[in-house]
Amino acid sequence: MTTEAKCPFLHPAGAGRALQEWWPERLNLHILRQNAPLSDPMGEAFDYAKAFNSLDLAAVKKDLEALMTDSQSWWPADFGHYGPLFVRMAWHAAGTYRIGDGRGGAGAGQQRFAPTNSWPDNVSLDKARRLIWPIKQKYGRKISWADLIVLTGNVALESMGFKTFGFGGGREDVYEPDESVYWGNEAEWLADKRYSGNRNLENPLAAVQMGLIYVNPEGPNGNPDPVAAAIDIRETFRRMAMNDEETVALIAGGHAFGKTHGAGPASHVGPEPEAAGLEEQGLGWRSSFGTGKGGDAIGSGLEVIWTTTPTKWSNDFFKHLFEYEWELTKSPAGAHQWKPKGNAGAGTVPDPADPSKRRSPSMLTTDLSLRFDSIYGKISRRYYDHPDELADAFARAWFKLTHRDMGPRARYLGPEVPKEELLWQDPIPPVDHPLIDAKDVAALKAKVQASGLTVPQLVSTAWASASTFRGSDKRGGANGARIRLAPQKDWDVNQPAELAKVLVKLESIQSEFNKAQSGGKKVSMADLIVLAGCAGVEQAAKSAGQDVTVPFSPGRMDTTQEKTDLDAMVVLEPIADGFRNYLQGKFSVRAEALLVDKAQLLKLTVPEMTALVGGLRVLGANFGNSQHGVFTKRPGTLTNDFFVNLLDMGTEWKPVSEEREVFEGSDRATGTPRWTGTRVDLVFGSNSELRAVAEVYGAADAQEKFVQDFVAAWSKVMNLDRFDLK
C-alpha cells in the first residue's frame, strides 16, 4: 500500500467542491451568519467604546507623527515621509463606500481582508498597514484597526501642514471578510462587465473596474481622454456620496501629496497578498525590478509627481494644472500620463529616493479632467484663485469620506469630534424633555388600540419607519420619524395615502397626550409610531390566545425637513422589501435573494428573518393589501399559520406565468385554489435551510415559541438605530 493510500487525511476539512459551485443559483444565506460571536476573539463582553474612551489619543497621534519620517529600510518612505502613503491607505479604506447599499467603507477595517487587501488599486497598502502595526500593537484593544487606519490618514495630513476638520472614533473591527458586498461579477482584475448600454454602471457599484477604488486614472478603459474621464469621475463619486465640489476638492487635495509608482513593467511584480506564499507573511506584490522598493517601486504603473512639495500642503496641484499646457506621454511601465509641453517645469520636482536628483511635474488623465470638464473646470479655477476655499472644502470632504459609513454623530467617539452638525449625518435633535414611563406607555397603547387603526396599519407603519435602517452605513431607522417627511412619506412602498391616514390619527393621539402633561413630558412621533406597532403586535398575539408584552424603550426624537438631505435620503428607498412582499419592478436578481440582502442590512439571522416574514404575512403587512403569502384564515392574528400551511403536502404549487414570480397553491386532491404566494413566500419551503427553520415554526407545539421569536426579532428591528441603548 502506498503512503498516500495509508494516510487518512489526504484532504482537509472544508476542501472539495463548494455547494455554490454545484448549484450556482443556490440562495446564499451565509451572509446572515457573518461576524458571529464565536468568530470574534474579543468576546461578547468587550466594550470597544469604553476601551477607546480610555485611550490617550494625543499619545497615539504623537507616535504616528514620529513614524511619518522614520523611514524603514524594508520599505523606505518616498521623499523621506510616509504621509502620502498613509493618506492613500485611509482614502482607499474609506473609498470603497457606495451609497446604493451603504456597504464598503472604512468602518470595520475590511482593508485587512480579501478581496480589497489584494485589489490592484491597493498595491503597497499591505506595507502601509504593516508600518503601523507597532502602534496598533502598543495600544492593543484600545484602538481598532479601522479607527487606526483613518486616524493615521488624518495625522499624515496634519504632519504635512494641513488642518483637518476632525476625527471621530468608534469603528469596531471585524475578523472576517464581508461577503455581503457585491463587488461585481467579473472574473478578472480590471475587467468591466459592469457596464451596459451607453456606459450604464450596474447598481450598486461605484468603481469602474473590478479591483479599482474609483476610476481608471488613465481614462475610460485606458483611453487618455480627460473629458470622457470626467463622465466616469462624476458618476463614480456621485455614487460615493460626493458632489462636484467635493469631488474636485478630494482629488486636488489628495494629489497635493506624494506620487504614483510605475518605475518598470508590471511583469516584474509578484502575486497579491492573498496569493503570495507563506513566507511573505501576508505581504504581496514582491517586485524583482531593481530593489523593488523606493525609487524602483511599481504600483499602478503610472509614474506621476504632481507638486514641487509632495510632503507639504500647497496649491501647487492647481498651479501646475492651469499654468502648464500638457501633452500625452508614457510612464516607464508604459501607462498613459501627461507632462508639460516643451519640458516646462523641468527640475522643479524632487526625486522620491535621491535628493540630488530632480524631475518634472506630471499629471494623470483624470487630473486633467478637473481642468477640461466644463463644470469641474470652473470649480477648479475658483479653488486655484481662492486656496483657503480649497483647504476648507478638502478638510470637509476628507472628513465626510472617512466618516460617511459611521452613521449619526452619536456614534462618534473622542475629543476631536467636530461640534458642527452636518446635513449628511442625518441629524436628529437630542432628547430635551422627560420621557414617558411605563404608565404612559400603557395609556398610549390603549389610546392606539381604541383609535380605529387596524393591526395591519399599525404594524405596517412601524415596519416602514424602522426597516429603512442599514447596518452597512448605520443610516435610516425609526429615530427621527422621517417617515413623516419627504421623501419617505411619498415612497411607493409606504403607500402614501394609507400612511397619511395613520399619521394623522397618531399625531392626534400625540397632541392630546402632550397637552395633558406637566413638567414638559412628551412623546415624540418617532416613539409613538414604534409604540403603536408594538401595540398592534400585542393585540394580534392576544387574538391568538397569547398575552405578550413587546419591549419598548422611549428616547427617539423627531427631526425636521430642514435637517433631511433629500438627495441622500433617496437611496434608502426600498426597491424591494420581501418582508412586505414588495417589488418596485423587474430585476435581474431573484426576489428571494433581495429578501436576504434586505435581511442582512437589517442585521438579521436566518431564524429572525424567517420569523419576521411568517409573522408579517399573517399580520397583513403586505404592500397594497396583497394576499400573496397570507396563508391563514385569521389575518391580523399572530399565528404560525404561514408555516403550517406552507408545509402542508395537501397543497400543490404551480407558477401562474412563465416569469415564475407568483405561484398558486391548489388542493392536491380536488384542484381547488387555496393560496397564492411569491418567490419570497415559497422559498421558505423550497430552500433546504429555510425549510428546516420553517419546520420548527410549523410544528404543532411551535405557536408559543414562534410568537416569542417574532416579538424578539421585531424588537430588534425597532431598535436597530438606538445606539444609545447599546
UniProtKB/Swiss-Prot annotation:
PTM comment text: Formation of the three residue Trp-Tyr-Met cross-link is important for the catalase, but not the peroxidase activity of the enzyme.
Residues that hold heme b according to the record: 255
Superkingdom, natural source: Bacteria
Pfam families named among the record's database cross-references: peroxidase
Cofactor: heme b
Region described as Disordered: spans on this chain: 335-362
UniProt entry tagged with the keyword Heme: yes
Enzyme class: oxidoreductase
Family stated for the protein in its record: Belongs to the peroxidase family. Peroxidase/catalase subfamily.
Protein name as catalogued: Catalase-peroxidase
Species of origin: Cupriavidus metallidurans (strain ATCC 43123 / DSM 2839 / NBRC 102507 / CH34) (Ralstonia metallidurans)
Classification of source organism: Bacteria, Pseudomonadati, Pseudomonadota, Betaproteobacteria, Burkholderiales
